[in-house]
Amino acid sequence: MKRFLAAILMLAILFSTQALSEGMTSNAPGEEGMAVASFDQDFLGYIHAQNEKENYVVSPLSFRTALMLAVEGADAATRAQLLGAMGFASEEEMTQWYATVRESVDFFEGWVARQEQIAEEEAQYYPSGEAPEAPAHAFRVLNSVWNNADRFGEFLPDYVRAIAERYGAAADSAAADQITDAVNRWCDEATAGLIPKISDDLSECAAALVNAVYLKSSWVDEFSKNMSGPEDFTDIDGNTTRRDMMKARDRYLYYEDKDTRLVSIPLNGGLSFIAVLGDDANWLSNYAAAEYTDVDLWLPKLDTESAFGSAALKGYLMDRGAVDAFDANAADFSRMADQAWYISDILQKARIKTDEEGLEAAAVTMLVLAEGAALEMEEPQYREFHADRPFRYYIITTSTPTPLVVFAGQEVK
């Protein structure tokens, strides 16, 4: 290939608008979809800027969902700051977003159930009484919270009840010498082995909030293995390597202008794999404008895994105003626990694999909480303002939409 694949997972696995309809609908996102996507675009842009010359895979959905577990236990400024950094104007908007996630999962599971029913009906036509086994499909968004029994603080019953009802989250407790293995085992099972471990040591944490996303789906039209083979791939530095390339000639949703080429490869269960060559700044609007076109498609097989830590994930949130949650003296998670906690670390691991049959991908995001300063015992943090040198002053109105300067002056001697 003579051009670099610009989006090796901004290649995004996109929740297509077909996911909520049995029929073929427009691929154009609605106003609400565009608003939701603005968080994804912003987050992906931040990650891309730090990994511009590396293959990577990341899950905005997993990151956002894990943060929802924190929001449910946060209060006051901590809660408001997290909501804003997550791109939500209100708690209601957050709830609506997660309802859309669940609708996408429910649609996928409905498709799987229909395929299983069809297979059962067709089994009678086979001599063995069993139809050929279909590829396994799964789309899971799972949540869990973990309390270190040997540290101070426990989850409040109201918090445990709320996250169970709203996000299906399971709450568990483990001793300091067991919590690491317990959390890693949960991640391994939730991701079918793609993410076998999220942490090497959680023994010192007070709690962990964990989300896992797992997807395994087949292409609507599978690639022929007979057409696959090695081809040149020119990387971002201009170096050429041989990559195992899948090939197809078919009709796909396709967009092209002088800077960009975009193709949408449909996956079963109401999902699409969007690949972009060139400038991907407007990939979502370009996808909305794509039309069915005959395409000679080459796509390299993927097996990419990534790990992101606090430098990227906590850094992203703090740059967008969510600072109190990470401050031991300011964090307010009083709706979560009976002791003062703060978020000490955020981790995400993700992996994606593709072949001629389909795609398998997983991500785990974990928020690690540590013991903070008790809010009721907190000493005020005074900022010094000593007018002991020349200064200016202004007397303004605060009852008007725009302040009026009634008096102004200075003292210099």
Residue ranges and their predicted role:
Residues 15-31:
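Sec-dependent signal peptide cleavage junction
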Residues 32-59, 63, 68-77:
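N-terminal targeting/tethering segments
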